[in-house]
Amino acid sequence: MKRPARSIILCGIKHCGKSTQGKRLAAALGLDFYDTDDLILEQCGMDARAIYKSQGKDAFMAAELKACEYLRDTLQAKGSQGQEAAAAKCAVIATGGGICQNEPAIAILKKLGTIVYLEVPEITAAGRIVREARFLPDGTIQNLPAYIANKNPADQKEVRAIFHDFYMERTKKYRSLADITVQAQGSRSENTKKILSELGLD
């Protein structure tokens, strides 16, 4: 199998399969795998959702940018060592669902590699969010993404309505910044093959 000349950066909304596909691609191509959400947890001692909820959007975006700066510096350092420098500079990177709003972070990632947008149907993504949520007897809903929870939905119907507006806005944004858009509607193995094919690595 061919090796990429640049890193592969996976983006898309929550639950589109970025981390799953990232690990599969890294294994198939023999590359290191990084997840910006994991880096945020390692660097800040709390996960991305907790930072957003307790410290706000600006603090979260700063943490996300710091993770991308770490990736840039790490991959550049690897690329300066030994005969396999070019290969070492390449990795597979899964990003957080809101990376499209973080322009400084996107600017770094675009210099590192190819931005691949994993697009899933709205009904699929909404269904995953609803399944993950906890609808309590007192009417409260737990474990929702912040952008939904902040609008205080009363029931599943309102959750889906809020998500619809979000999905349309994010889809437009991701399509505009991505180098490649992949319709990730198949099985895990099918989606991996699609990504490799779109990248010319099959």
Model-derived regions, located:
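NTP-dependent small-molecule kinase module
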Residues: K2-I8, R24, A28, C90, ...
